[in-house]
């Protein structure tokens, strides 16, 4: 939540990227005790949320959503009573919480596995906080040498409607915008998205002026 000029935080990133049009203040639940972060511990072990392998992980999943959404529902039910009803979690009044971020202890799994940073929307499992339904969420991992505040901003940008700009197919070197756009690569501190992306998906820019010869 830090918002000093040089602070590296998701709040400060969106403050600058939106030209002070968006405040991205986060609230942590369960509430910390002194300087200790308190976490929900699930009823299943970690390998239950890793891909199935007949030999190395027979308890693993074959359907990600069937494991992930019940997990997130239990986590929400665990913390729901901590969230004050005075906190506005649905600013557009559509009945859904604007966004929820789940931070999971430990390191990431393989690309696109359940234990990999992603944005998604819950379905098939209904979870509520103060009468508001959980829909769009970000899934983040606590520990990683690669994922930083940039990943927080990347996944939150998905929640705001921004698409990925990298190619999903392995074996290709195509990188449309490389390190020049948050939705294509990660840097620390996080780089901004392109002017077009901020105009098209963020609607933080009214128009893009055409710069021609002699302008």
Residue ranges of predicted features:
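Extracellular hydrolytic enzyme modules, especially secreted metalloproteases
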Residues: 99, 105-215
């Amino acid at each position: 939540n830090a918002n000093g000029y040089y602070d590296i935080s998701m709040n400060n990133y969106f403050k600058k990227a939106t030209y002070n049009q968006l405040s991205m203040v986060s609230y942590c639940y369960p509430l910390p005790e002194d300087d200790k972060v308190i976490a929900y511990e699930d009823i299943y072990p970690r390998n239950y949320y890793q891909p199935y392998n007949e030999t190395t992980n027979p308890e693993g999943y074959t359907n990600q959503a069937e494991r992930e959404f019940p997990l997130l529902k239990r986590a929400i039910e665990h913390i729901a009573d901590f969230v004050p009803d005075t906190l506005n979690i649905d600013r557009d009044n559509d009945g859904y919480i604007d966004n929820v971020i789940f931070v999971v202890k430990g390191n990431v799994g393989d690309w696109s596995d359940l234990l990999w940073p992603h944005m998604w929307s819950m379905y098939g499992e209904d979870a509520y906080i103060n009468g508001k339904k959980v829909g769009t969420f970000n899934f983040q991992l606590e520990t990683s040498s690669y994922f930083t505040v940039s990943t927080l901003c990347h996944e939150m940008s998905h929640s705001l409607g921004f698409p990925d700009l990298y190619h999903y197919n392995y074996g290709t070197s195509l990188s449309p915008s490389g390190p020049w756009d948050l939705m294509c690569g990660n840097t620390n501190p996080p780089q901004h998205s392109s002017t077009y992306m901020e105009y098209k998906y963020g609607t933080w820019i009214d128009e893009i002026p055409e710069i021609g010869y002699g302008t």
